[in-house]
């Protein structure tokens, strides 16, 4: 929604929720992502079928510090969509070369990220468990969200490229979730990332 408010792209293709091609660079575009792994997986199928070669998901996640950026190397899978596509392992990778090049571009624009694996779950209201299951043990998940595993499943299945960056919007660093919506820290992180993407 914020990208649309900035009027930086033009709706060009009515597929995958609508592809907006960037006004300053017609090789780049954006679409509003669907919610949850099955939704984003279906959207990714549509976008890849329409000819999109690479997808970078920009989303929100629960993590340790509101406003932090997490650039993911892949997702610990706690969803059903991956198994339907034949991926039975606990971890599904993002595309390393795309993640590496995106990391370099972000650094050039002054955005530093926490990098590593994260947890994708279908259970949006039981996410506080992530600290015990994935963060506090040797797995070291950097955040928890609900779409990444679905996207990476389709990218791997279709031999396309995908990665993701998450802005920590709520914190599980205490016994209860602290929601960052409306806080200047979160809003500043959102605007900084969007400004960097618009200038890509």
Please give the residue ranges for each predicted region:
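A C-terminal functional module that forms or caps the active site or interfaces directly
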Residues: 130-169
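Metabolite-binding pocket within alpha/beta catalytic cores that recognizes anionic/polar moieties
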Residues: 1-97
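His/Asp/Glu-rich mid-to-C-terminal helical/loop segments that flank catalytic regions of hydrolases
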Residues: 172-200
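Conserved active-site and cofactor/substrate-binding residues in soluble primary-metabolism enzymes
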Residues: 35-38, 42, 50, 93, ...
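Glycine-rich beta-alpha junction loops
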Residues: 62, 119-124, 150, 167-171
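Active-site rim beta-loop-alpha module in soluble metabolic enzymes
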Residues: 90-138
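Hydrophobic/aromatic beta-strand patches that form the interior of the parallel beta-sheet core
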Residues: 56, 70, 114-116, 163-165
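Generic non-transmembrane alpha-helical segments
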Residues: 101-109, 154, 192, 196-200
């Amino acid at each position: 929604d914020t990208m649309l408010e900035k009027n930086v792209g033009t709706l060009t293709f009515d597929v995958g929720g609508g592809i907006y091609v960037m006004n300053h660079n017609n090789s780049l575009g954006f679409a509003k992502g669907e919610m949850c792994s099955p939704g984003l997986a279906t959207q990714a199928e549509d976008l890849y079928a329409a000819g999109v070669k690479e997808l970078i998901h920009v989303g929100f996640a629960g993590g340790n510090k509101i406003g932090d950026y997490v650039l993911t190397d892949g997702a610990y899978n706690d969803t059903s969509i991956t198994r339907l596509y034949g991926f039975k392992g606990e971890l599904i990778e993002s595309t390393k070369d795309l993640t590496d090049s995106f990391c370099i571009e972000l650094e050039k624009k002054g955005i530093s990220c926490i990098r590593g694996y994260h947890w994708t779950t279908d259970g949006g209201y039981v996410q506080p468990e992530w600290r015990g299951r994935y963060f506090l043990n040797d797995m070291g998940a950097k955040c928890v969200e609900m779409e990444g595993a679905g996207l990476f499943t389709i990218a791997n299945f279709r031999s396309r490229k995908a990665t993701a960056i998450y802005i920590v919007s709520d914190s599980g660093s205490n016994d209860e979730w602290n929601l960052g919506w409306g806080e200047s820290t979160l809003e500043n992180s959102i605007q900084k990332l969007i400004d960097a993407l618009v200038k890509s």
